[in-house]
Amino acid sequence: ADRDSNAAFQVLANILYNSDGSPLKNKIISSGICKDFGGLYLSSSCFNTIMMTYLVGSEATHLEAFDQLYRETLKQMSDEGLDSDLMVSELNKYEFNVREDASKAQRGLDLIGKSMAAFKYSNDPFKALKTEELLSNLRRKALEENYFEQLIKERLLDNPATVKVILEPDPGKIAETAA
């Protein structure tokens, strides 16, 4: 992944997992298999990416139903296209956050951190500081080239490096640690 796709995944994670207007989030919550649904995107300075989705208030027995609904809904979103108003809203939010970060008091330290991380992995340290080109390219690709839909298909649906993890509480753990 590169800087452009990292930025795209940040916006896409909000569209898919965190926005109240997300068809994916709304379908999963309305299905009754969980109380809440969310997800996040993690990246490193060397552009390694992880997309994580989670259910809150669900049971392990709902894993297959969740996986089927998740994949069907992502496929539908990728085939039919994402809602342009939702994309514009999340792109605006991302752009606002990027510009807001540029006005922080410790801006110099942030710039050094961004450029050093890029330099460390043999990337252009100055490219990491240029946001205008990043923002305009992201907006153009998302709204004119079905970029987010392609990412959903290639990186989420057709990705062989997918892991499913179930975390269940141990009801006796509190009593055990208190003893």
Predicted region positions:
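M16 family metallopeptidases and their MPP-like homologs
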Residues: A1, K25-K141, P160-A178
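Active-site cores of enzymes that catalyze phosphoryl transfer or operate on phosphate-rich substrates
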Residues: S19
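Nucleic-acid-processing active sites and adjacent nucleic-acid-binding tracks
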Residues: F148
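Core subunits and conserved enzymes of cellular information-processing
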Residues: I152-R155
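Active/ligand-binding-proximal structured segments within catalytic/core domains
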Residues: D4-L16
